[in-house]
Amino acid sequence: MRLKPVYATDPNLVDAPLTEVPNQWAPQQGIHLYHFPLSLDSQKVRQGLEELGVQWQSHPILLSAHQQFSPSYVRINSRCVVPTLIIDGKVTTDTINILDLLVARFGTTNKCFETSEEETELVNYWIDKAAGLFIEAL
């Protein structure tokens, strides 16, 4: 399981994604997703949660109203981006990071996630390549 995208070289960097980091300001029980309904990355995580049959609570963050900069959200995700997944008070950020965590934690109970080890490695290779692209250079 990949828990750190290729661009995160120092876990202390603000830009580094979080993986199950305890947070006193986050909801301490249950599974919570902070997301923007029209965000493609948020849609990917919602789809993953549904495909895996995970029960979760929705916390819409309205980007047009700048809710991602509210003090309560910044305490949870200092990058001020969506989506953010919280499981029992532990924060995970970055779409691919979240999906990797969900598959590892909740198993592959759905055919969408069933693959051979070779197929999984190939998919992970291309996901890492895409995550490492410097979009502004394109």
Q: For each predicted feature, which ranges?
A:
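GST-like domain detector, emphasizing the conserved glutathione-binding G-site
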Residues: 1-138
